[in-house]
Amino acid sequence: MKASLGSIVREARELFRHHGYDGASMQDLATKVGLKKASLYTRFPTKEALVPEVLILTNEELFAELPEGDPLAAYALVLERIARGLSQEIRCVGLHLAYGASGPDTPDAAVAVRGFFTGQRDRLAALIAPSVGEVRARELAGDAIARLEGATVWTVVEGDVEPMARALRLSLEEIASTPRR
């Protein structure tokens, strides 16, 4: 069976999401995608090499097919996608990788993790900056991500998705009530 790069990256994302960086193994990934471990290493020389690809894919999915001509609707849609993903999957692959693969032993992964979150913030901010200004847009986007990511605590420890719904609602209310330029 010949596994596509996309299928390898998607399966790696699920392993990272559910087992963290340290708990995910190249052998487990090879087994999941139907490859020998040696074949997997010809495509990705290290586990760390998968991290940027996993995070790029995740952000590409979040920002895919946004409504044109309505940046506020696009902003809301991305936040809804983040909230839905975190509620359904329970764990954020970005946070798992931030805790497990962002130290001096994994410098490329650390750069990718930082880029994942700052990239989300900056792309969200770019959507709303024409309406609220660059500084305020960056604050709103950063706060929204922090709220949504923080709400995963209650999804994980109590199975309660209501804090996620409130975090989304508060983030959308905040942008709606921010004075326009």
Question: Which residues are covered by each model-predicted region?
Answer:
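Solvent-exposed, charged/polar functional surfaces in cytosolic regulatory/catalytic domains
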Residues: 57, 61, 65, 81, ...
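Amphipathic C-terminal alpha-helical segment
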Residues: 85, 145-163, 174-181
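Amphipathic alpha-helical segments used for helix-helix packing
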Residues: 86-114
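Helix-turn-helix
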Residues: 7, 11-49, 53
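Hydrophobic/aromatic residues within well-ordered alpha-helical segments
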Residues: 47, 54, 58, 62, ...
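Amphipathic alpha-helical packing segments from all-alpha helical-bundle domains
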Residues: 73, 77, 106-131, 142, ...
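Hydrophobic alpha-helical connector segments
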Residues: 53, 64-91, 141-144
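Short, charged helix-capping/linker segments at alpha-helix termini
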Residues: 22-23, 130-138
